Amino acid sequence: MNTVIFACVHNAGRSQMAAAFFNALADPERARALSAGTQPGPHVHPEVVTVMREVGIDLSSAQPTRLTADLARGAELLVTMGCGETCPIVPGLERDDWNLPDPKGRPVAEVRAIRDEIRTRVAALVATRGWQRMAA
């Protein structure tokens, strides 16, 4: 089982959306995603919950999680969300950084654009690694 960790500082927006899209698109027998942050916020941003609900994904009960060594153990890839020097680093883990704006406090139209960019990047990652769900 391949594990991808999507991480940002607060684990309340971008990384939550990315993990949710990944788990919707990837074959659960081949890969899964977790999301985490170095300084988890109290809840997922309301505007993120709203725009994800629009595409059929419910994040209303999702809780920000701290990125720990235990969580990272066994992961194949860490994808950070453009948080610059504050992005988490896990020694020995392959890392990619997606330079995406933080959706916190942005108008819903901007959060939708961020959501759509994340969905596009996640779909490309899943396809490139060969982790997509097989057609029934």
Segments predicted by a language model, with ranges:
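Conserved small-residue
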Residues: 11, 52, 78-79, 118
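Alpha-helix C-terminal capping/helix-to-coil transition sites in glycosyltransferase folds
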Residues: 72-74
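Phosphate-binding/catalytic loops
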Residues: 77, 83-136
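Conserved active-site segments centered on acidic
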Residues: 1-68
